[in-house]
Amino acid sequence: LPILLLSTLLIAGIAIWILRNQAVRTQWAVSAAFAAVCWLLGMTLIFRYPAILRFSVWQPENLFQSPLLLSLDRTSWVYLYAMTTVLLAMIFTAAARPAIASAGVRAFWFFYTGLAILAILAANLLTLAITWALMDFMTLVFYVRLAGRPLDVQRALFRSGVDMVGVLLLLAGASLNHLAGGDTLITTPFVSLSGVFLVLLAALIRLGLMPLHFGAPGFEPLRRGLGTLLRLFPPAVSLALLTRMFEIGLPEATRPWLLLAGITGMIVGGIRWILEADAIRSRPFFVMGVSSLAVLVGLNGAGAEGVRAAGVMLLLMGATLSLAEIHTPANRIWPLIAALVLIGAPWTPGGIIAGLFGEAFVEGRALVTTVISVIGMAALGLGALHVFFEEETPWPTAESLTRLTYGLGLAIPVLVGIGVGIWFRTLPGLSGLIVFGSAALFGGAGFLLLRRLPATQAQRWQAIADRVDPQPVYRLLWYPLRSLARIVRSVGAVFEGEGALIWMFVVLLFVVLALGAG
């Protein structure tokens, strides 16, 4: 069934491209139908795990000793199901957006989701590195295609460069663990401490926690539709890796670094998420805040359960807040519920996190971290209220079917989040309810404080927060990178034109000699 789901996503993208000359309504209907089928297939996979799909080892075996390996288990299923839910919600709400997506963009929806699901299913570091690299390459091509200014191209290249560093660290960690006598599986404990550090650093870099960076470039055409996938899927894939690492157990030596990354990201992400009024521009800070919460709940003794819940919350509540536009008073319900989930409402992923923090507090474990995390949860919920208080905008269409599918698109992630929360943990504990109440009190106090705050003071705080921005550093790094690109371009000119044929024969000659020597 995982192969059936992946095949359906591939067929959907191809079908949309074939129908590119058809009416927009037809393309949307086909996209919605395929997304619904993928969502149902993802739901049925709950009855199919655990399952492992193994491909043959690449040749030569002395160079590629790890096969491509996919694993369907509790962790991969819930991330997979959340991703298909985000895809379905994004397509359902697309009918009510004034911007019309082209057939190429619609096909990209399905191809990109398929790559993200492959990364979730990856059971070893080789498979994960390949899927990460494919996602990064596909994203870079799309960003460069949409970039309208040189600055946009510059930001896209640096974002891809940061992600590529994560891929290289992942491969380096796999190599060190292999040299120490271990394997490349992410379901068994690591042998090399250095390998663990590098793999964790790869995940933290792609999450934007170490060093701090603020996600993908913000292009105007990517506000709510495709931008939701590009903002949420890469960090969710990294959180899935982090979940695996907590499942197999982490050395004590890694805890101080993870704690530093979690607290720093929670402070910066939480404050920026509150102060930024536009929910679309503030999405990177939402991702940073939830990712930091995942790290902190994992360190509090909760292990993989809390990280898994945070990853699902990132996908589902992030989709609701990213896709929501207020057209009627009824549309405000779903951002409000999302805010309650973020502060730990029972029977939700946030409630699971609240319960785990409550248990840690009762047992006297990491009290300071627990208090910081509860305040961070309050900040996440408070920032989500920006969407709740947005001004109403008129419907772009008068069709009742469009309004119905839009409402369903906002409701589905929230309802799935509640269902997943009940599936994870049926009964909320008293300590979890206390944490939820505490986060609600902190959030209420913060709301009253911000309401009484003069506008000039809020703008001053916003200006101070804007100084924590990595873009000036990126601009400084752009100059040596551009010089390197010129060198590469001049070297590449040797291979152009009539000289290309000669160089091709030289390369073939070296290959023949190498094979003969082997």
Please tell me what each predicted stretch does.
Residues 22-27, 107-194, 205-208, 273-335, ...:
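Alpha-helical multi-pass transmembrane bundles of energy-transducing inner-membrane proteins
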Residues 54, 61, 90, 197-257, ...:
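Short helix-boundary/re-entrant hairpin motifs in multi-pass inner-membrane proteins
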Residues 294-301, 355-370:
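Interfacial segments of multi-pass membrane proteins
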Residues 1-4, 8, 12-99, 103-107, ...:
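Transmembrane helix-loop-helix hairpins at membrane boundaries of multipass inner-membrane proteins
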Residues 426-433, 453-518:
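Aromatic-capped, Gly/Pro-kinked transmembrane alpha-helices
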Residues 62-78, 191-196, 362-370:
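Short aromatic-rich membrane-water interface segments that cap or initiate transmembrane helices
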Residues 335-344, 375-381, 401-421, 471-486, ...:
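Hydrophobic membrane-spanning alpha-helices of multi-pass integral membrane proteins
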Residues 213, 310-334, 364-411, 439-466:
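Predominantly late transmembrane helices and immediately cytosolic-facing juxtamembrane segments
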